[in-house]
């Protein structure tokens, strides 16, 4: 007797003339297909969309930076002449720089009555401060007006990623134009190292920061102290890492198979129950079942 390979077929075909179509079965089949289509599109969207997950760990991620952090500052002082505006930098490693001018620019505002300071500089990875003041001016003004607007203050590379909502420019748009003109302003910054890793494994390094601020008129035993805008910073030991991830193909295929198989199975059970109940009801109406 020749071997019949067809005996391994677990999907035996039933002739159409031995099956009975029903309206209920048609409705269930249409609903089943629509439900499968909806779930398939939902899973496909999730498969195509890149997910960004974050984690925290203790480390210095950017060890190749030489212990430096790049800073970008853009600030307007509408009531202070440009020749009076200067940037001073100091930290716990002994750095003390007055009137930093490298990679900086002063743009006159209000016909020269005000000034917009834009600068890029680097700071050491130790606690310290940088401040905008009149300390570097050859002739100190009597009452410098330190009201200001901060357009940008960022550390490290600028990350422009849709899925990440971090405090990379937390002070952007800060407005102190209605403050006491003679007051100093202290911004206390906690800088948080941040790593962003894309799907290819390429990493970019940046820094987020939290901020608290206070405004005060400072005095010493010799009288009122010349006001300034202070940015006092410290680094957090915690690093935030964002990683782009996409659902693996095998998991997507497994989910689609589960959706199709599970939906058809449940729909088949539901159709069978409805059909059996309707047949039993017909027999009751015909008096065949008492």
From Swiss-Prot:
Glycosylation sites: 74
Lumenal side of membrane: 48-254
Cytoplasmic compartment spans: 1-26, 276-290
Keyword match Endoplasmic reticulum: yes
Keyword set, alphabetical order: Endoplasmic reticulum, ER-Golgi transport, Glycoprotein, Golgi apparatus, Membrane, Transmembrane, Transmembrane helix, Transport
Domain of life: Eukaryota
Post-translational modification summary for this protein: N-glycosylated.
Keyword Transmembrane helix part of the UniProt annotation: yes
Cellular localization per UniProt: Endoplasmic reticulum membrane; Endoplasmic reticulum-Golgi intermediate compartment membrane; Golgi apparatus membrane
Gene Ontology cellular component list: endoplasmic reticulum membrane; endoplasmic reticulum-Golgi intermediate compartment membrane; Golgi membrane; nucleoplasm
GO biological process, any: endoplasmic reticulum to Golgi vesicle-mediated transport
Membrane topology: Multi-pass membrane protein
Transmembrane segments: 27-47, 255-275
Primary site of residence: endoplasmic reticulum
Job description of the protein: Possible role in transport between endoplasmic reticulum and Golgi.
Family note: Belongs to the ERGIC family.
Subunit structure: May form a heteromeric complex composed of ERGIC1, ERGIC2 and ERGIC3. Within the complex, the interaction with ERGIC3 is direct. Interacts with ERGIC3/ERV46.
Name of the protein in its database record: Endoplasmic reticulum-Golgi intermediate compartment protein 1
